[in-house]
């Protein structure tokens, strides 16, 4: 059995699994997410929302023995709503940044948030940005991927074409108007899972992760939820959820299968280096 190591080291799946119990002091947690960010959360035909982060929220509630009161709202109102006390914490996929860590607490990362290229199925794999030189890259207009691709247009030598939705940008690849589409890795993976005409290509690592945000006054709650997240990594739940919603199996080193020492994400404000062993049911 391996134990959590000091700051800067990690525990990988299979190296640690201890039995224990998690006790909650509340019957219900009010949480929120953006209900239009597929495949993390999206409307159901019968009402309500479904997706990776909906499953994540419900599994956290199940393991804590509490009800998760999930609100689907516009992204722009989520962080202010949490800070105002409307929500106990957010279950929306939230990119952890240095700026955000100054005003909020975060769990350790549970998913990588990278830039993923999609190409027509049968296209040879591209192993780096240089492989897209002279190609047309389609993007969702106004997105972070649009801005990023345009910032590299001269350096890489690609042409960027913007579309009103990422679905339209993917269709441009299928029709041959574009060589590749670039979007978030989870969004791209979901698109490939649903469409046999396209395939995943180069994945550009940003070094960033999705983590769960809490108010600065909630370190105990953050740590309690992080304990559950770590257990879900250790017992393969995150792997199963990734395969279900993204069609992708996490590889060693991915945030979905990596338990970090301490509480929070190493290197960011709010991180606690306190050694602990996840207590898993």
Per-region residue spans from a language model:
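Extracytoplasmic small-molecule ligand-binding "clamshell" domains
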Residues: 26-94
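Beta->alpha turn/N-cap motifs
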Residues: 32-37, 71-76, 85-97, 113, ...
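Periplasmic-binding protein-like
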Residues: 35, 111-119, 189-229, 248-270, ...
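Hydrophobic residues within well-ordered alpha-helices
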Residues: 60, 82-83, 132, 173-174, ...
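Ligand-binding clefts/hinges and TM-proximal coupling segments of bilobed small-molecule sensing domains
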Residues: 67, 144-161, 196, 200, ...
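Short helix-initiation/N-cap motifs at beta->coil->alpha
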Residues: 69-80, 124-125, 160-175, 206-208
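A ligand-binding cleft/hinge motif common to bilobed small-molecule-binding domains
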Residues: 77-80, 92-102, 150-151, 172-206
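Flexible hinge/capping segments at coil-to-helix
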Residues: 120-137
